Amino acid sequence: MVYSHHHYDHIEGGKPFKDAGATFVAHMNAKTRLEALKNPDVVIPDIGTGNLHVIELGGTRLELHYVGRNHSDNSLVMLLPKEKLLFTVDFIPIESLQFRDFPDSFLPDFFDSFDRVPSVDTQNRPVVDT
């Protein structure tokens, strides 16, 4: 289970997965923040990552990239390189710069983090905003 970042709407509901034996991964800053909460309903990540963490599972490679401060100081970008799928959460704008007014957002760093997002040849595939 990968937490994209520490905000509650992205970390809630993990207990059944943990009970089933899942390993939880998040950026080290998210892990530190969640440990400080001391909330028994929040699963603390087992692994805190740095700038790059690779998960190989069943022949599939998932890369977790930390691209710097933006929507939070611990947002991860997820890349499936073989499939050419890139997942960003809450900080890549399609029509506007989203979610920039959270207390832990880093507006000056948003644009720098865009430059660090892994490049993917999309072969004219659509970009979907969620």
Where in this protein do the model-derived segments appear?
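Metallo-beta-lactamase
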Residues: 54, 68-130
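Short, P/G- and charge-enriched loop/turn segments at secondary-structure junctions
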Residues: 51, 63-66
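Catalytic cores of transferase enzymes with a strong primary signal for eukaryotic protein kinases
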Residues: 2, 60, 80
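Short Gly/Pro-enriched turn/cap motifs at secondary-structure boundaries
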Residues: 44-46, 66-69
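Short, isolated positions in well-ordered beta-strands
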Residues: 62-63, 85
